Amino acid sequence: MTEPGQVPTGKDMADRMAITEIIALHCRGVDRADEATLKSCYWPDATTAYGSDAVPAHEFCGQLAQAIQGYDQTHHMISNSIFAFDHEKAKVESTLIAFHYLKADDGQDTEMTYFGRYLDIFEKRRNIWKLKHREPVMSWSQNAPASHDAYHPALSALRQAARFPDDLVYG
């Protein structure tokens, strides 16, 4: 462990960058409903606790990719990651903001905004950092009628995000 504010070593910075990449890649996996990308973020023996009990993470990745397709669009963002290293393990707390857009047949589309944190345990094996355990903690959420307007003149020329494998990131 390091003292808060202590200048990190080059190794510490490299470890932080590798972990930060996995955290961001997980967000991409969720937003694109990409099961393979989600699984690549976890060790095969990893667990996750999106409810009261820890479950095998690789099994959950398939369920999450399927469930997220129920939304027309999602956007997950991470900020304020705090790292606590202990040799080849790291506890990481990251602030999460997630937006969910749901179209409705009756035209009453909704937006759900979620604020919380990911409490993660990472392990480094063979010089690779991956998640060993993830537990989201909710701070609050807000549901409201949708204000999304993809056809606004300022936005209408932009390509729309899509799920795996149709999103531009896979091209």
Give the ranges of each region predicted by the language model:
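Short beta-strand edge/turn micro-motifs at domain boundaries
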Residues: 91-93, 115-149
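A solvent-exposed, acidic/Ser-Thr-rich amphipathic alpha-helical stretch
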Residues: 35-102
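Short beta-strand segments enriched in hydrophobic/aromatic residues
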Residues: 30, 42, 96-98, 135-138
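Transmembrane beta-barrel outer-membrane domains
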Residues: 17, 71-74, 111-113
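Short, cysteine-centered beta-strand-loop-beta hairpins and adjacent loop/turn segments enriched
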Residues: 99-109, 142
